[in-house]
Amino acid sequence: MRQQLPRQDRTKSNNDQGLYKKFQVTRTDGTSNPGQKHYQCEYFVIDIDHDPYARAALRAYALACRNTHPQLYLDMVNRYGLDEPV
């Protein structure tokens, strides 16, 4: 199992920090509850509205999954306009 992420160092700006625990994610299907498949899973959250690198990350993910999850690929392209240049 991976080491837990450190907490935010409030003496540093976000630009001066690497990975740290910023969010507590709970799945809506209940599978993040104790004993379930996704209990204690680590998630990487992207702020689609404010992160200048979000579109590039979304595009890379959509392209990576398009053969195995074609509907997810199409949904991401349509919702986030990923057919447009980054």
Language model features with spans:
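Polar/charged low-complexity regulatory segments
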Residues: 1-65, 70-86
